[in-house]
C-alpha cells in the first residue's frame, strides 16, 4: 500500500469512517512504521484541538517500554548438569515411596479390626455328606412324581409337586405380557424339552 493511501486510510480511521479491514491495515502498518505512528499522533492532536478537547502532553509509553526492554540484560540460563536430573529423580522417588507407605498404612488400619473379628468368631464344622449325586426328574403325568432323593419327609414333597406348575405359569404369563425385559427369555430347564 502506498504512503498516500495509508495516510488517507489513517484519516478515515480518525474520522470513524473506516471499515474493519482498513483499521486492521492501519494498525499493522503502525506496528512496523514509526513515521506512520507519529503521523497518527499529529492527527490525534489536531482532532483534539478542533473538538476543543483537553490535550495531554505527549506520552509514548510503547517507545519507553521498548527502550527499557532493549536495555535490560537477558536472564542467565540455568545450568543443566547431571545433579539437577538426579535431584528431580530423588524427589519423584520420595513422593512415590510416601504415597505407597501411606496407602499400605491406611489399608492395614482397615484390616486390623476385620482380622480381630475373624479371630474371635468360632469355626463351625459342617457335616460332609458322602453319596451319589441326586437327580430330580419332572413329568406331566397326573400321577405322583417319582422322587429319587433319599429323604422321605412329606414337607419337601410339595416343592417337587408345585415347582413345575409355577415354572409353566411363569413362561405362559411372560409370553402373554410381551414386556421388554430379560425374564421372558429365561426358559425353565425342565420345560424346554416339551
Swiss-Prot record:
Topological relation to the membrane, as annotated: Single-pass membrane protein
Record-annotated membrane-spanning stretches: 89-105
Keyword Transmembrane helix (UniProt): yes
GO terms assigned for molecular function: sigma factor antagonist activity
GO cellular component: plasma membrane
Organism field: Pseudomonas aeruginosa (strain ATCC 15692 / DSM 22644 / CIP 104116 / JCM 14847 / LMG 12228 / 1C / PRS 101 / PAO1)
Source lineage: Bacteria, Pseudomonadati, Pseudomonadota, Gammaproteobacteria, Pseudomonadales
Its job: Negative regulator of the sigma factor AlgU. Plays a role in the differentiation of P.aeruginosa into the alginate-producing form. Inactivation of mucA causes a switch from the non-mucoid to mucoid state resulting in constitutive expression of alginate biosynthetic genes.
Main location: membrane
Record flagged with keyword Cell cycle: no
BP-aspect Gene Ontology terms: alginic acid biosynthetic process; regulation of polysaccharide biosynthetic process
Name listed for the protein in its UniProt record: Sigma factor AlgU negative regulatory protein
Family indicated by similarity: Belongs to the RseA family.
Disulfide bond residue pairs: none
InterPro entries per UniProt: Anti-sigma-E_RseA-like (IPR052383), Anti-sigma_E_RseA_C (IPR005573), Anti-sigma_E_RseA_N (IPR005572), Anti-sigma_E_RseA_N_sf (IPR036147)
Keywords, sorted A to Z: Alginate biosynthesis, Cell membrane, Membrane, Transmembrane, Transmembrane helix
Protein's cellular compartments: Cell membrane
Amino acid at each position: 500500500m502506498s504512503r498516500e493511501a495509508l495516510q488517507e486510510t489513517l484519516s478515515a480511521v480518525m474520522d470513524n469512517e473506516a471499515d474493519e479491514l482498513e483499521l486492521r491495515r492501519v494498525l499493522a502498518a503502525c506496528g512496523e512504521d514509526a513515521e506512520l505512528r507519529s503521523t497518527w499522533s499529529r492527527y490525534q492532536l489536531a482532532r483534539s484541538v478542533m473538538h476543543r478537547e483537553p490535550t495531554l502532553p505527549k506520552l509514548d509509553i510503547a517507545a519507553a517500554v521498548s527502550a527499557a526492554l532493549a536495555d535490560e540484560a537477558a536472564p542467565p540460563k540455568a545450568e543443566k548438569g547431571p545433579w539437577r536430573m538426579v535431584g528431580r529423580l530423588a524427589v519423584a522417588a520420595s513422593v512415590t515411596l510416601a504415597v505407597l507407605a501411606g496407602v499400605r498404612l491406611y489399608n492395614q488400619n482397615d484390616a486390623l479390626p476385620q482380622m480381630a473379628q475373624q479371630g474371635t468368631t468360632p469355626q463351625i464344622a459342617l457335616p460332609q455328606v458322602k453319596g451319589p449325586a441326586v437327580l430330580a426328574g419332572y413329568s406331566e403325568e397326573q400321577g405322583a412324581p417319582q422322587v429319587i432323593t433319599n429323604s422321605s419327609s412329606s414337607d419337601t414333597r410339595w416343592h417337587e409337586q408345585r415347582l413345575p406348575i409355577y415354572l409353566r405359569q411363569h413362561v405362559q404369563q411372560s409370553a402373554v405380557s410381551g414386556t421388554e425385559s430379560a425374564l421372558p427369555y429365561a426358559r425353565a430347564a425342565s420345560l424346554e424339552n416339551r
